[in-house]
Amino acid sequence: MVQKLSRRLFLSIGTAFTVVVGSQLLSSCGQSPDAPIADTPGEQQEINLYSSRHYNTDNELYAKFTAETGIKVNLIEGKADELLERIKSEGANSPADVLLTVDLARLWRAEEDGIFQPVQSEILETNVPEYLRSPDGMWFGFTKRARVIMYNKGKVKPEELSTYEELADPKWKGRVIIRSSSNEYNQSLVASLVVADGEESTLAWAKGFVSNFAREPQGNDTAQIEAVSSGEADLTLANTYYMGRLLESEDPAQKAIAENVGVFFPNQEGRGTHVNVSGVGVVKTAPNREGAVKFIEFLVSEPAQAFLAQNNYEYPVLAGVPLNKSVASFGEFKSDTTSLDKLGPALAPATKIMNEAGWK
């Protein structure tokens, strides 16, 4: 069972947390994170999940978790930054058990702000590759997405493409589009360049890359793919699952957009293609720590990984899980296995570089 709690309902949280959901009272916030979980007969366990992901497939997955464990999921949705600020403002009495969000940048900020507590779990350490999780067990990636070059098949040949760095070449002038520098996916990508190439080289790259823009940054990844498909530009950088959605759409027009666009994995002869994650961690003041850990372990289990791969067009973190057929059609690729935790300190210089280069 997934109980979605409205944003307005939580705005009145003060030093104590009491909220009625239907006929149930949630009043476990005073419990220590390490305290044992009550096992009163007939009393259903529950966790409060703060999530910035807004996919219907996720709700189905949470219902599967409840069916398997008996633990109800109270879902509180919001934008990532809003949820981070809410948890901080709620302080020691925060009802949040789990914070789930997209992108390294948000996970890093949450860890830096002291929102997470460490988790030791053999399941998590086995199922999640080391480079996709915090070395201290603060957060764990549970799905991957690759940030790839997507190109108009009629205007660009794949053999013309090679690396992220090469996109600063003047031959691409007026041919490139991308979303805003305020987007966390782009910030994490540039952070990966800072780690790989250094700040000075990345600044030079960013200036060249920006000079190749066909228009000012606007729209999300889908908007970039649509513009490339229509011929407004020749190529973009976008996350793979956006293309998966278009290819799997029941709308013929959406499929047609995708069919005009090719997917190219950059840097295959070197460090590999940049990958990012949706990630999750146990909140420091979690009333139900045990239930929170069970939830995260469930997310990286084989059935959950298969469900996410097939229905949300993401790459699983668990090895051996079959991909959605449309995602599999992109081909196999080499991932950049630089620890995402190492990219965290590079986010601030990456943002500065993007601003200095004029990336709006």
From Swiss-Prot:
What biological processes does GO assign it? iron ion transport
- Gene deleted: what happens? Cells grow normally in the absence of iron but have a reduced capacity for Fe(3+) uptake; double knockouts of this gene and futA2 (slr0531) grow very poorly in the absence of iron and have a marked reduction in their ability to take up Fe(3+).
The family classification in the record reads: Belongs to the bacterial solute-binding protein 1 family.
Which residues of the sequence carry a binding annotation for Fe cation? 54-55, 185, 241-242
Instruction: Tell me where it mainly resides.
Output: membrane
Gene Ontology MF term list: metal ion binding
Keywords for the protein's UniProt record, in alphabetical order: Cell membrane, Ion transport, Iron, Iron transport, Lipoprotein, Membrane, Metal-binding, Palmitate, Signal, Thylakoid, Transport
Membrane-spanning segments: none
Q: Where is the lipid attached (N-palmitoyl cysteine)?
A: 29
| One Pfam family, short name | SBP_bac_8
Tell me what induces its expression. Answer: Transcript levels increase when cells are grown in the absence of iron. Protein levels increase when cells are grown in the absence of iron.
Lipid modification (S-diacylglycerol cysteine) maps to: 29
Give the organism the record lists: Synechocystis sp. (strain ATCC 27184 / PCC 6803 / Kazusa)
Q: How does it sit in the membrane?
A: Lipid-anchor
**Compartments reported by the entry:** Cellular thylakoid membrane; Cell membrane
Any single GO CC term annotated in Swiss-Prot or TrEMBL for this entry: plasma membrane-derived thylakoid membrane
Q: What is this protein called?
A: Iron uptake protein A1
Q: Where is the signal peptide?
A: 1-28
